[in-house]
Amino acid sequence: VCDVDRKHREQAKRAVDDRYKNNNCKAYLDFRELIGRGDLDAVQLALPDHWHALPVIEAARAGLDMHGQKPFARSIKEGRAMCDAIHRYGRVWQTGSQQRSDYNFYHAARLVRNGRIGKIQKIEVGLPTGGSHGPAKEMPVPENLDWEFWLGPAPWRPYCDFGRGNCHWEWRWIMDYSGGQLTDWAGHHIDIAHWGMGWDTTGPVEIEGQGTYPESGLYDTPYEFKFTCKYKNGIVMTVANNKKIPQGTKWYGDKGWIYVKRGQLTADPMDVLKEEIGPGEIHLHRSRDHKQDFLDAIKTRQLPVAPAEVGFRSISVGLLGEIAMLTGRRIRWNPDTEEIANDPGASALLGRSYREPWTL
């Protein structure tokens, strides 16, 4: 186990030792020491977004398979570098977009994919609404935390109360580390929208929208947002926080609609939900348990239900929406070359500057 917080390290070690009734679990502060052991098959990564890229690339080079949390990456250039490393070294990757292993989401996506509501006219995706907070209160670094390592490639800043407690949760609302609810949930509901449309390896061509950002204080990610994504076939997907669009994914076809969120699947007409997919139709990967699907893929060397390219393309939509809102401009995106046309300012936001000594 590995963590920059000693309390977390010790807690994780105890959990493993208790499970195996011994004291053999090794605990590390530096992920490079764990990855470099030479006797591992796979690793599970649950890190702040700004720390997603470097450990993944390092683990791929070391020949390890990986289960990693969404969002896949904090920037598009990081995501592409991660995908390239995973593919180059032939590693299995499962993104933690566990809704793909939930029957309701799977069933909704396969019905849409097989034309049960006709030709798709538009898509709506609702994500959670964010929040704001007052000024940060600078504090001494907890003695159990390696703050320098926690920051890693992100810009340096003094340790603070993070608004509500410590750094292990509230980092999500600070752009140096995350994109707020938008990027936190893009890997869930945008991911399902893509699955139903067969867009797992592509993306939109035009993105524009607006976000509402805190005027002051520690948090600087948008707490409200709405943007549209136009795809090559002309279909427009609208993504917004749940005060504007109900949370979940909704496809509108010329023969009806299907809406799915956690704990709910509905449609008009309702009878469409009773339909099955025939032998000659499109069959999506059926996973009944997300982590078991990953373990099975390690053994078979087949793609799991949420492989690297899928995770990358899903978060790319959220990241492009972020860029469109930050610049206030319509973004013209080429999903094949992964370039923004005729906008150097927007293009600069495709990557992130790394603090020394870290490099991508």
Q: Where do the PLM segments sit?
A:
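Conserved beta-strand->loop/alpha-helix structural units within folded catalytic cores of enzymes
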Residues: 45-49, 64, 68-69, 94-98, ...
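A contiguous active-site-proximal alpha/beta segment in oxidoreductase catalytic domains
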Residues: 65, 72-149
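Acidic/polar loop patches that form or flank catalytic/metal-binding clefts of enzymes
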Residues: 119-123, 158-161, 199-209, 236-239, ...
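C-terminal helical cap and adjacent loop that interface with cofactors, partners, or active-site loops
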Residues: 177-201, 216, 224-226, 245-360
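Non-transmembrane alpha-helical segments in soluble domains
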Residues: 13, 32-35, 44, 56-60, ...
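N-terminal glycine-/serine-/threonine-rich beta1-alpha1-beta2 phosphate-ribose binding loop
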Residues: 1-68, 74-92
